[in-house]
């Protein structure tokens, strides 16, 4: 069985740029062409297929065209699976099935939580896995595939790293394994930060040890890490930032599962070259001439490397894995298949250039002049230069540690600490604001509708009384807060918000929950906590009761009356 693995294709990246608009599509077409020529059984995509959460019509049109051209044919897939996949549809002749998870760029959003991958799945072109309802627990069931050998694929779409870490630590993510999982080749594919970052990464040490291969999307540098479990970082297929991590070659990977389990990497020829360098100028004379000569030297060197690259054949990277595809054998797997080179239509690709210039004086460089001068020679003339100045050494002063970066959602939650919310969640409100900023104009409408539906469903319509409504409103708000707080949980900040709230609104149970997470005796914390507020006093029991009874009389034919006036 052969599986092509790719990730972070970012289709639609810079599609408004007349030079770079085709880059993401050309490379993705090359990848699908490799899959077709190598006659792979499956394409496994690790998230961020699209660059935008709401891709343009042009982007969707070109993407659908590529899938139809390379994945539909007369030769039917010979795979067998436990789930209904698109190659089971007799009306669509799928020859190369594609299985994909969502990333942080194309994650589900909106009222109906729809991802661009959902659209491709509805069209019968892609099989979408790894989409879960993030409430209390995630049950990950594998996609089981058989063709001579057996593979179990566990998909986990992008989740905010803090929430994912907490859910793993609390045992709220469960991988359901088949009874004879030792006889399957177990693959986990997810879209998270792997490289350690401040509070924002997910370590493979948290994952159970029965996986043979873990595929990390999201990281743009291609990398293979050997160990008890093989870790594959396919990397991106288009350069979306001009940094050191993007300068390396880009690859597609082919996993061969059989008597010998091997992993090959195929260098992608259609990726636009990236040239990075640094220039330090200490003298004030002929500054612009030095910069111009440096850029031209970078371009000439890039052309020489490109000509050498075109003469090379594709390399292979082989890794030995213990054999777990048939029976109980634990024999070490060797390596040996030879990978072929691929002939592509030659395109003239002017390079991306990034030159960092460090000036020691007060010289002035005109970026616009260089931009006009190298237009047609450089793919990004407007942002190819980064200029910094070396400041004179000043007297040493005591440095203070940098304060932790404060996000707008934290500020908003602090402001909303004194706002009386009857049904809506304060944390849900800040989350909806983030979605609104991303471009989802219906974010607030969806939040309100979701919370009202929860209250309506929780109330017994046959014998509705004001106490039932009050309890349902309180419970809905509490459940939403509990769900949203997983993303940006800051215990001490939360206690600070409670301290600033009106004493009548300080919820003892909520404060005890935060205090217990900070450590210490819960009884001692309880004595310091504020008194529990009275929900009936908060909402105005008498006034609310009259209004509810009046609405019930006016809505005798429709018991699902509106709660909007009580929010």
Swiss-Prot record:
The keyword Hydrolase applies. The keyword tRNA processing does not apply. Component of the MRN complex composed of two heterodimers RAD50 and MRE11 associated with a single NBS1. Core component of the MRN complex, which plays a central role in double-strand break (DSB) repair, DNA recombination, maintenance of telomere integrity and meiosis. The MRN complex is involved in the repair of DNA double-strand breaks (DSBs) via homologous recombination (HR), an error-free mechanism which primarily occurs during S and G2 phases. The complex (1) mediates the end resection of damaged DNA, which generates proper single-stranded DNA, a key initial steps in HR, and is (2) required for the recruitment of other repair factors and efficient activation of ATM and ATR upon DNA damage. GO terms for molecular function: 3'-5'-DNA exonuclease activity; manganese ion binding; single-stranded DNA endodeoxyribonuclease activity. The gene is MRE11. Mn(2+) 1 binds at residues 8, 10, 48, 220. Pfam families: Metallophos, Mre11_DNA_bind. One of its GO terms (cellular component) is chromosome, telomeric region. Keywords: Chromosome, DNA damage, DNA repair, Endonuclease, Exonuclease, Hydrolase, Manganese, Meiosis, Metal-binding, Nuclease, Nucleus, Telomere. Residues 513-533 are annotated as: Disordered. This is Double-strand break repair protein MRE11. It comes from the Eukaryota. SMART domains: Mre11_DNA_bind. Mn(2+) 2 binds at residues 48, 104, 191, 218. It is found in: Nucleus; Chromosome, Telomere; Chromosome. GO terms for biological process: double-strand break repair via homologous recombination; double-strand break repair via nonhomologous end joining; meiotic DNA double-strand break formation; mitochondrial double-strand break repair via homologous recombination; mitotic G2 DNA damage checkpoint signaling; telomere maintenance. Belongs to the MRE11/RAD32 family.
